């Protein structure tokens, strides 16, 4: 089995031809992107052919999305029963790489469609209840049981879409996370001012 791991972005600029080559040559592909607009394009262009060939295209496997995606999956499996919502709170230190910074600037002009909280989901897999409970939040607040202040996490917009896609794909494979499952991600800060 051949696998290509790509770790340098912006992926919308450098990754499309690489993914196309992987599908053509029947190699699996994974990367660390947070560029959901680009991932949506990959899904539209390559999902069916890759699936028919048994090829896995797995974007968003870096530090940004993996804790949220695997964390939600782990939570569901540990409960051993249907779960309707998972919220995660990330406290992070450090900054962004040059590629991440460039990506942030290129995403500013995205269409309303690309800002959809379910942009990565398979078509017709979203209920009205899920849509209502899955809006991007920019509120700063204190939550019972969580020490500190919660606010918008730097990668929340990217990560929430990744987790929602995973949940939808699991549901299509008869392994649902829960009825009308929703997911939220928040930054965790020591003071209100930092949030």
Residue spans for each PLM region:
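Rossmann-fold NAD(P) dinucleotide-binding segment
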Residues: 1, 12-31
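Gly/Ser/Thr-rich loops at beta-strand to alpha-helix junctions
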Residues: 36-38, 62-69, 93-94
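General beta-strand structural signal in soluble alpha/beta enzymes
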Residues: 31, 57-59, 88
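Rossmann-fold NAD(P)-binding glycine/threonine-rich loop
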Residues: 15, 20, 33-55
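C-terminal catalytic/substrate-binding lobe primarily of soluble NAD(P)-dependent oxidoreductases
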Residues: 54, 77-195
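Short glycine-rich anion-binding loops that position phosphate/pyrophosphate groups of nucleotides
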Residues: 10-11, 62-63, 125
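Active-site-proximal alpha-helical scaffold in enzymes
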Residues: 68-78
């Amino acid at each position: 089995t051949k696998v290509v791991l790509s770790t340098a972005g912006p992926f919308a600029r450098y990754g499309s031809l690489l993914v196309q080559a992987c599908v053509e040559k029947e190699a699996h592909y994974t990367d660390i992107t947070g560029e959901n607009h680009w991932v949506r394009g990959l899904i539209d262009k390559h999902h069916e052919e890759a699936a028919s060939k048994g090829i896995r295209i797995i974007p968003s496997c870096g530090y940004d999305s993996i804790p949220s995606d695997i964390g939600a999956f782990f939570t569901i499996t540990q409960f051993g029963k249907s779960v309707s919502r998972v919220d995660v709170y990330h406290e992070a230190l450090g900054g962004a790489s040059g590629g991440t910074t460039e990506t942030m600037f290129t995403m500013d002009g995205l269409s309303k469609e690309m800002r959809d909280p379910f942009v990565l989901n398979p078509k017709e897999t979203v209920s009205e209840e899920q849509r209502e409970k899955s809006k991007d939040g920019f509120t700063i607040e204190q939550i019972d049981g969580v020490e500190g202040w919660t606010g918008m996490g730097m990668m929340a917009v990217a990560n929430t879409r990744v987790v929602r896609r995973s949940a939808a794909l699991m549901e299509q494979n008869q392994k649902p996370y829960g009825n009308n499952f929703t997911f939220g991600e928040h930054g965790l800060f020591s003071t209100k001012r930092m949030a």
